[in-house]
Amino acid sequence: MRIEEDLKLGFKDVLIRPKRSTLKSRSDVELERQFTFKHSGQSWSGVPIIAANMDTVGTFSMASALASFDILTAVHKHFSVEEWQAFINNSSADVLKHVMVSTGTSDADFEKTKQILDLNPALNFVCIDVANGYSEHFVQFVAKAREAWPTKTICAGNVVTGEMCEELILSGADIVKVGIGPGSVCTTRVKTGVGYPQLSAVIECADAAHGLGGMIVSDGGCTTPGDVAKAFGGGADFVMLGGMLAGHEESGGRIVEENGEKFMLFYGMSSESAMKRHVGGVAEYRAAEGKTVKLPLRGQVENTARDILGGLRSACTYVGASRLKELTKRTTFIRVLEQENRIFNNL
């Protein structure tokens, strides 16, 4: 046993220090990034935000809606090959280039993903997703996927420390998914005692990944557009959003009605709700590590997308970054004990 004494920080623990700027307007900020990925060799340009691969977020409808904003969607792994075929038949090439195919690590997952990727060559992203990316089996699966799909861009996770980030990149991942326990409907930290404050995880993993020519996506912990800006400021190449994109018409959650008001169910992918839906229930040897919440319906996702992108542009103007690419270099974090004036928050 050992104790690390240095303080680890989440998004709520910091603010970004403003700096002198020559920008005249938020409209002067360029949010699009251009990337060439380490292993796949693929080039990609777009806004580096990803809708999470949760079945109440990462839907085909979400992918179609967010593609118009140049945003990616990691489509959840529970769609059938036939449903994928129908989606591809009704989608433009522009939509398909904004889609990630999500998969687990079983043999059945591998075969299903292979069938989906064979449907259309425009599907260039694979998201290999498990709750605990520290297992040897997971690393071996990433290597297997890289061998099978040498020209596909592979995103793999989740991990929160530099050494495991390096391990995954060396095994074939182009992008490492960073985050254990920060999600709005994740209870891993309270069920297991395991986790890592998200901002510190992003900073540590970005340093490790960039040293090897890899990239990271910050997955979880964002509750506001300001948190998205902090994730990019901390070195994230991409930011994945779940709760911020839940509750919309495109989100795919079940709608329930209480006292004449409609709500949409949103749950973690390790929750009892998710396991009942997809595997028949919680296995006797494990505990649910997610919760289910009811969200007031939020309308179409386009309004939320505009709000997120607008906040991100504004953050860039406050530090003098004319491009999102410059935000990390222009960011100085200050530790704080407060984020906002909350006097009217309950009204």
UniProtKB/Swiss-Prot annotation:
The record's GO CC annotations read: cytosol; GMP reductase complex
Which superkingdom is the protein from?
A: Bacteria
Q: Does the keyword Oxidoreductase apply?
A: yes
Q: Which InterPro entries match?
A: Aldolase_TIM, GMP_reductase, GMPR, IMP_DH/GMP_Rdtase_CS, IMP_DH_GMPRt
Q: Which GO terms describe its molecular function?
A: GMP reductase activity; metal ion binding
| Keywords, in A-Z order | Metal-binding, NADP, Oxidoreductase, Potassium
Which residues does the Swiss-Prot or TrEMBL record annotate as the active site? 186
Q: What is its EC number?
A: 1.7.1.7
- List residues binding NADP(+): 108-131, 216-239
Q: What biological-process terms (Gene Ontology) are attached?
A: purine nucleotide metabolic process
Its recorded reaction(s) are: IMP + NH4(+) + NADP(+) = GMP + NADPH + 2 H(+)
Summarize the subunit comment: Homotetramer.
Describe the function of this protein.
Answer: Catalyzes the irreversible NADPH-dependent deamination of GMP to IMP. It functions in the conversion of nucleobase, nucleoside and nucleotide derivatives of G to A nucleotides, and in maintaining the intracellular balance of A and G nucleotides.
Sequence similarity: Belongs to the IMPDH/GMPR family. GuaC type 1 subfamily.
Q: What's the protein called, per UniProt?
A: GMP reductase
Species per Swiss-Prot/TrEMBL record: Shigella flexneri
Q: What is the lineage of its organism?
A: Bacteria, Pseudomonadati, Pseudomonadota, Gammaproteobacteria, Enterobacterales
